[in-house]
Design a protein with these regions (language model features):
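Basic, polyanion-interacting recognition surfaces, primarily
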Residues: 2-146
Length: 146
């Protein structure tokens, strides 16, 4: 039996998932999800406000998250780049204060994917001599429009 059900929005993409378990029934806005962790057969869906736990497999929930900023660095973890504040060392920090620690290889792949995600949203800076430094310098030297 499915313990969650996607609720479709106007653009034919799911906006919410309904979570049904023996102890709770809830409707979670997909864009509010920060982290999804798998612990055995149980999924923990973490939002800035609370954590929801229910029995379901990752493969059932992944299609619902398609075409959004979700990234799966390891088999039992999905993070939402829209909620990431920063990635430092081996830790991903979220705007809500939640943190996720990863191993060296996983954090390297996650950092690379997060950089690609961030490059979709200018302005950005890679510092002196970075790949985009000439483009940024040209923007700064352009006279202001009146």
């Amino acid at each position: 039996m499915k313990n969650f059900n996607p609720i479709m929005g106007n653009n034919n993409m799911p906006e919410y998932i309904s979570v049904i378990s023996s102890s709770q029934c809830a409707r979670i806005r997909i864009d509010d999800i920060e982290v999804i962790e798998q612990e055995g057969r149980k999924l923990h869906v973490i939002t800035p406000d609370r954590e929801y736990s229910f029995y379901e497999s990752m493969k059932e929930i992944i299609p619902v998250l398609a075409c959004r900023a979700f990234y799966r660095p390891i088999r039992g973890l999905i993070i939402n780049f829209d909620h990431v504040k920063e990635i430092t060392g081996n830790m991903v920090s979220f705007h809500s204060g939640q943190c996720v620690t990863m191993g060296k290889n996983s954090i390297t792949r996650t950092r690379t994917a997060y950089k690609k995600y961030l490059l979709r949203y200018p302005p950005y800076s890679l510092g002196e001599g970075g790949e985009y430094a000439p483009m940024i310098a040209a923007e700064r030297s352009r006279p202001e429009l009146s």
